[in-house]
Structures are given as structure tokens and as C-alpha cells.
Amino acid sequence: MKLKLIVGLSNPINLYYNTRHNIGSWYIKFLAKKYKKNLIKNKKYCFYYIDVKIGDYYSKLVIPDTYMNVNGTIIYNITNFYKIYSNEMLIVHDDLDLDTGIARFKFNHKNSTHNGIKSIYKSFGAKCIFNTLRIGIGRPKLNKNINSYLLNNPSPKEEILIKKTITKCIKCTDVLIKKNKDHAMNILHKK
């Protein structure tokens, strides 16, 4: 599968990097590290990026450096500038509805309650279709405030599990690009 753009949804990195809601940016940083690349800041358009060759294709790795609810504007501008179709994107984000340690690909994504995903639809239009990689962070226990939960760091135990999950996701992204989505899903979705 050809992915020209892989985006890790994020709030401003300097303020929120280690939080649950910035799992997408964790993923991009881990992926850049795998390819021994350092992200470059585009100050004019508020995002970090780097180009990496995965298999036979170059993919642009991006972390928006703005608030989650406006990530879509940055992504839209990038796709317009580089002539990337929405179905050539993989959007990586946290997911409250998946337990910590679980991740899922979703192809031809069409809706979500995630603010970053809503922002993409707002910028691209409701008919936009793209691919996602959802990384589970679980829900807070005892009905704690969701926003507080998202904007706090995971426990040390959760962090270890999240990092293991991201490592597995990166291997599966390689399979997705180099082989096919069915093979990647079989590996990622296997318990």
C-alpha cells in the first residue's frame, strides 16, 4: 500500500508530548528514530516532518505542532502542497475505546469522535476517506474527567505497554507498505 503521508495527531509537542492524547506524535518520533532521522520543524506552517523511504516508496512523516482540534488544517495544507490524496494518508492517533496495549488499523475511515479526526473532516469535507492507526489508551477508571485523562501522562506501567504497542505498530506499518493491508492487519490484530 502506498502511503505518501503518515501523520501523528498531536497537541503542541513542547507542552503535551508525553500525554496520552499525543500518542500519534510518539509513533512518528519512534518511526523517525527507526530510520535514523531527525524531525525538522516547519515554523511557517507549524509542523514537524521528515521524508523516509519505506520499501519502494518515500513517505512524509508529520507531527502537527498545534492543538488537536485544528490539526486538520495543517494536514489539508500539506496534502494540497504535495499533491497527496486523502486515501494515501495514514493518520495515527490515540483511542479511548481500545484498551492500552491494543492497536487497530482502519481503512477507508469515515467517522470518529476523536477531535483530531473531526478536524480532518472539517478541513477536507465529510466525504474524505483516509486510513487510520488507532492506538489504545483505555478509558479512565471511576468516570474521571476525560480531558484531564487525555492531557496527563500515562502511568509508568501504561507507558511501557504503549511503547511496546508502538513498536509493534511500526513493524506492521512496514508490512502494510511493503506487502499488503490484510497481512499487516493479521499481525497487528492478533492477540
From Swiss-Prot:
SUPFAM superfamilies (alphabetical): Peptidyl-tRNA hydrolase-like
Name of this protein: Peptidyl-tRNA hydrolase
Binding site for tRNA: Y16, Y67, N69, N115
Residues making up the signal peptide according to the UniProt record: none
Compartments, record wording: Cytoplasm
Main location: cytoplasm
An example Gene Ontology biological process: rescue of stalled ribosome
Role of this protein: Hydrolyzes ribosome-free peptidyl-tRNAs (with 1 or more amino acids incorporated), which drop off the ribosome during protein synthesis, or as a result of ribosome stalling.
Keyword terms, alphabetized: Cytoplasm, Hydrolase, RNA-binding, tRNA-binding
Species name: Wigglesworthia glossinidia brevipalpis
InterPro entries on file: Pept_tRNA_hydro (IPR001328), Pept_tRNA_hydro_sf (IPR036416)
Catalytic residues of the enzyme: H21
Site (Stabilizes the basic form of H active site to accept a proton): D94
Cited CDD domains: PTH
The reaction(s) this protein catalyses: an N-acyl-L-alpha-aminoacyl-tRNA + H2O = an N-acyl-L-amino acid + a tRNA + H(+)
Gene3D superfamilies: Peptidyl-tRNA hydrolase (3.40.50.1470)
UniProt cross-references to Pfam families, sorted A to Z: Pept_tRNA_hydro (PF01195)
Any single GO CC term annotated in Swiss-Prot or TrEMBL for this entry: cytoplasm
Family of the protein in this entry: Belongs to the PTH family.
Enzyme Commission designation: 3.1.1.29
The protein's assembly and partners: Monomer.
